[in-house]
């Protein structure tokens, strides 16, 4: 890992890539870039209240502090279902879901946004990675007594792949599942949706 260095250029070579930073050149097989999005809301009227993280504050119907003005998607923080706390989750599924809620509330506020589990999946190299609900590290910020368990699921017989490695995060007192992460060379992205359903009440 190389922190606090600005990437100046990336050059593809026969053996991988050369990453030029403000401090050095790094030869490697591949690179993974983690980018963090944040809403650019400087243009907003000052009457519209914001949260501490500068996202737009909304009520359960996604209406802002100004009547008949709603906000959706990457501009808002959403409720985290398992712990009833808000968090910023710039995901396309949250944008679509919040947009649908607002569309239903334009004439009359009748649909509440139930929150998000931040369910996501991707493929990095040969591995599929998926997550829903709380991670173990995020659990440090919440009052529940959390525990985790590692689970291994063999590959289905007709799929000649590898096992699925998973981690379940749960409330130690109530035994309620609060989060899950999966990793496998097999496509496990659909399985995270099943785990997300188990977290929802």
What are these regions (language model features)?
Residues 25-101:
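FAD-site-proximal beta/loop scaffold in flavoenzymes
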Residues 2, 70, 147-149:
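General small-molecule cofactor/ligand-binding pocket signal
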Residues 7, 20-25:
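A structured beta-alpha segment of the ubiquitous adenosine-cofactor-binding alpha/beta core
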Residues 15-19, 143-146:
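Short, hydrophobic/aromatic-rich segments at coil-to-beta transitions
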Residues 3-15:
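A conserved short coil-to-beta-strand element within the FAD-binding core of flavoproteins
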């Amino acid at each position: 890992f190389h922190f606090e260095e600005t990437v100046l250029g990336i050059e593809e070579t026969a053996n991988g890539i050369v990453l030029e930073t403000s401090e050095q050149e790094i030869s490697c097989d591949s690179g993974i870039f983690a980018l963090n999005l944040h809403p650019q809301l400087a243009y907003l009227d000052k009457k519209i209240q914001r949260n501490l993280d500068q996202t737009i504050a909304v009520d359960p119907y996604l209406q802002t502090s100004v009547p008949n003005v709603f906000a959706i998607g990457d501009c808002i923080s959403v409720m985290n279902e398992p712990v009833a706390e808000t968090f910023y989750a710039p995901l396309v599924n949250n944008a679509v879901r919040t947009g649908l809620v607002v569309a239903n509330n334009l004439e009359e506020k009748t649909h509440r946004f139930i929150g998000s589990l931040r369910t996501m999946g991707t493929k990095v190299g040969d591995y599929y990675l998926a997550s829903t609900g709380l991670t173990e590290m995020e659990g440090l910020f919440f009052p529940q007594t959390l525990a985790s368990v590692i689970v291994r699921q063999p590959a289905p017989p007709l799929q000649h792949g590898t096992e699925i490695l998973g981690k379940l995060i749960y409330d130690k007192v109530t035994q309620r599942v609060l989060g899950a992460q999966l990793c496998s060379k097999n496509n496990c992205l659909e399985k995270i949706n099943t785990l997300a359903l188990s977290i929802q009440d």
